[in-house]
């Protein structure tokens, strides 16, 4: 797979931009807040259907504009595919593949795969559980585009059940009478989310452990574990549903007092440990960076295994966060086989060999320019 071009119109701070990609390595250099991350965000939007930096499409549209356009040309499996997404404030998106409008966003996923690694990804270790859940979901959206619908159904069921729990118009008896129906809906929607996350961790964990051993020299043992509220000794749907139903009954009184659902995949945790010690609490900054790097390289490898294509790698100002050893491990893993787009504020972070084999472009105030003159 190779990303040949990216076009932006009224996206973030880009009025109009056309990026042609001819090299396996592209370095975007510029000061902070010039638009480097915005360009990578647009690529990730086409790959996953969502932004990790914006809650609403309105935030992605240039100030004073009503809509934005993101498009790309991708070469994959011997074919060239044109992808396009139109964003409108407060309205549904329009997605096109090969010039044909698709009925749903799901139908436009699966043509472009990418792994994004930014300084914000250090929150995978030290951040809230939601950060780790979002990371899992982002991978699943690329491995199984239908997961978009699976996740949306759960979110809808969760919001509806929470609205019922918060209702001030229902008596305790009326609430107790209606909850079992909403319990069933929540459980049926939650089960496929939890089973997919569990299977993903089962496949990802050994890859991450191997990468971590390579980076750390085998001095530490890294473990990634899925920690839902229920036991996953039996992973079949019926067992998961039964366990969720039993836990809902246990939490019913507490849920009524708090007015929110306390059972489901929105409460899942992903445990990251080094030598059986929680990395979030006790890992040094260097250990945490090694851990995140191992997770990202494992993600890259898993996407290639499942899709049969090497995904695009987006590195957003992350090299400055890594020491020389970890930089070498990352850049060595990439080499020529992984198409990579890197953003940076300084070219001094790259060795001369890497620079010679890369296309260097400048980003300034939402404009893409020619390579800077050598010093």
Curated annotation (Swiss-Prot):
<keyword id="KW-0227">DNA damage</keyword>
<keyword id="KW-0742">SOS response</keyword>
<dbReference type="InterPro" id="IPR042174">
    <property type="entry name" value="RecF_2"/>
</dbReference>
<feature type="binding site">
    <location>
        <begin position="30"/>
        <end position="37"/>
    </location>
    <ligand>
        <name>ATP</name>
    </ligand>
</feature>
<keyword id="KW-0238">DNA-binding</keyword>
<dbReference type="InterPro" id="IPR003395">
    <property type="entry name" value="RecF/RecN/SMC_N"/>
</dbReference>
<dbReference type="InterPro" id="IPR001238">
    <property type="entry name" value="DNA-binding_RecF"/>
</dbReference>
<keyword id="KW-0067">ATP-binding</keyword>
<keyword id="KW-0547">Nucleotide-binding</keyword>
<dbReference type="GO" id="GO:0003697">
    <property type="term" value="F:single-stranded DNA binding"/>
</dbReference>
<dbReference type="GO" id="GO:0009432">
    <property type="term" value="P:SOS response"/>
</dbReference>
<dbReference type="GO" id="GO:0000731">
    <property type="term" value="P:DNA synthesis involved in DNA repair"/>
</dbReference>
<keyword id="KW-0234">DNA repair</keyword>
<keyword id="KW-0963">Cytoplasm</keyword>
<dbReference type="InterPro" id="IPR027417">
    <property type="entry name" value="P-loop_NTPase"/>
</dbReference>
<dbReference type="Pfam" id="PF02463">
    <property type="entry name" value="SMC_N"/>
</dbReference>
<protein>
    <recommendedName>
        <fullName>DNA replication and repair protein RecF</fullName>
    </recommendedName>
</protein>
<dbReference type="GO" id="GO:0005737">
    <property type="term" value="C:cytoplasm"/>
</dbReference>
<dbReference type="GO" id="GO:0006260">
    <property type="term" value="P:DNA replication"/>
</dbReference>
<dbReference type="GO" id="GO:0006302">
    <property type="term" value="P:double-strand break repair"/>
</dbReference>
<dbReference type="GO" id="GO:0005524">
    <property type="term" value="F:ATP binding"/>
</dbReference>
<comment type="function">
    <text>The RecF protein is involved in DNA metabolism; it is required for DNA replication and normal SOS inducibility. RecF binds preferentially to single-stranded, linear DNA. It also seems to bind ATP.</text>
</comment>
<comment type="similarity">
    <text>Belongs to the RecF family.</text>
</comment>
<keyword id="KW-0235">DNA replication</keyword>
<dbReference type="InterPro" id="IPR018078">
    <property type="entry name" value="DNA-binding_RecF_CS"/>
</dbReference>
């Amino acid at each position: 797979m190779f990303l040949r071009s990216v076009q932006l119109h009224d996206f973030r701070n880009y009025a109009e931009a056309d990026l042609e990609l001819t090299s396996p390595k592209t370095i975007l250099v510029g000061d902070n807040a010039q638009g480097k991350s915005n360009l990578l965000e647009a690529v990730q939007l086409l790959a996953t259907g969502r932004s990790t930096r914006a809650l609403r499409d309105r935030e992605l549209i240039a100030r004073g504009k009503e809509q934005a356009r993101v498009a790309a040309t991708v070469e994959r499996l011997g074919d060239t595919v044109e992808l396009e997404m139109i964003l409108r404030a407060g309205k549904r998106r329009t997605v096109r593949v090969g010039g044909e409008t698709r009925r749903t966003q799901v139908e436009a996923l699966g043509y472009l795969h990418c792994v994004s690694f930014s300084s914000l990804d250090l929150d995978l270790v030290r951040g809230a559980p939601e950060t780790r859940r979002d990371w899992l979901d982002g991978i699943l959206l690329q491995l199984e585009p239908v997961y978009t619908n699976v996740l949306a159904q759960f979110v809808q069921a969760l919001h509806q059940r929470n609205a019922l729990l918060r209702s001030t118009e229902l008596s305790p008896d009326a609430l107790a009478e209606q909850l079992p129906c909403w319990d069933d809906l929540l459980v049926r929607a939650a089960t496929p989310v939890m089973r997919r996350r569990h299977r993903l961790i089962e496949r990802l964990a050994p890859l991450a452990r191997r990468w971590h051993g390579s980076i750390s020299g085998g001095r530490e043992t890294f473990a990634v574990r899925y920690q839902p509220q229920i036991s996953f000794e039996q992973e079949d749907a019926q067992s998961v549903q039964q366990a969720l139903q039993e836990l809902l009954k246990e939490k019913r009184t507490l849920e009524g007092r708090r007015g929110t659902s306390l059972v489901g995949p929105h409460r899942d945790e992903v445990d990251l440990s080094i030598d059986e010690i929680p990395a979030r609490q006790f890992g040094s900054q260097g250990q945490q960076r090694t851990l995140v790097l191992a997770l990202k390289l494992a993600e890259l490898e898993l996407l290639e295994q499942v899709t049969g294509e090497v995904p695009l790698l987006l590195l957003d100002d992350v090299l400055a966060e890594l020491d020389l050893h970890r930089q070498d491990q990352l850049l060595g893993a990439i080499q020529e086989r992984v198409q990579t787009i890197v953003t940076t504020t300084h070219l001094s972070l790259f060795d001369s060999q890497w620079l010679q084999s890369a296309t260097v472009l400048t980003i300034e105030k939402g404009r893409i320019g020619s390579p800077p003159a050598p010093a």
